[in-house]
Amino acid sequence: ILIESVPGLAKTTAAQTLATCVSGSFKRVQCTPDLMPSDLVGTQVFDFASQKFTTQIGPIHANFVLLDEINRSNAKTQSAMLEAMAEGATTIGGQRIALPKPFMVIATENPIEEEGTFNLPEAQMDRFMMKAVMTYPSPDEEARMLAMLTRRGSDMIGPDTITGERISVSDVDFLRKAARRVHVSDAIMRYAVDITATSRGAGSRPIKGLSSLVRLGASPRATTALTRIGQAKALLSGRDYVVPEDLKAFAHEVLRHRIMLTFEALADGVVSDQIVDKIVETVPVP
């Protein structure tokens, strides 16, 4: 999951809280320009006592990994991160080490600051299943947050304040497998394909003039992600089958970082969410 927002909206706290709710291992990596792949993945260290190399695994070998401000890490380190995400394993000194299951990467980025940052390439952005954009809270929500801070006498709301029973790793694995068993009809599959194909200028009802706004549409990986998330949404709704509303509910999160706009569209102030709105509105619902 990629989380984007301006500073001060608790991206890091939200990611930490999600990981803390599950009793699995959690590691946080503060990304900086000098962060090396070995700092993340691990390395081999020579032990003078035994005269042998020993493998020290890095922080990415955890159930939940928070990559804070991922766009501050250099391209080489970003590639190492996303290789682990894609393959579910790392290679240290020629030795292939599998990552624990479940494995989830939560990355945050600040879209405003550009100095000392390295934007994620399109191919690497596509590795993220979802991209969530956090917006400012409403005045009522901000007032409730302030009231919570005042009552607790603390200036921060941290994940360590969570009380109650946490979800076990085995529970998460069970829910993942249960979601995969949710029925997806042929009509829903075609609907998911139609949504992503429309972003590429194809589909059953191509959008006129889309090529002047979009230079790169969503890949087939987006179709898979949209279907998987639809299955999870159906499971959480108490159904054993997927309906079109399950896909539409998360179309923005799945597609917004996979649709690359043209320079003309960016100059006119067009954002990818507007394109997704048009796609969802245009594609016929089965």
Where are these regions (language model features)?
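Conserved beta-strand position immediately N-terminal to the Walker
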Residues: I1, V65, F103
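Walker A/P-loop
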Residues: I1-T32
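Walker B catalytic acidic pair
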Residues: S5, D68-E69, A80
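C-terminal engagement/docking regions of AAA+ P-loop ATPases
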Residues: K177, G201-P286
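Conserved alpha-helical scaffold flanking the Walker A/P-loop in AAA+ ATPase domains
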Residues: F46-L66
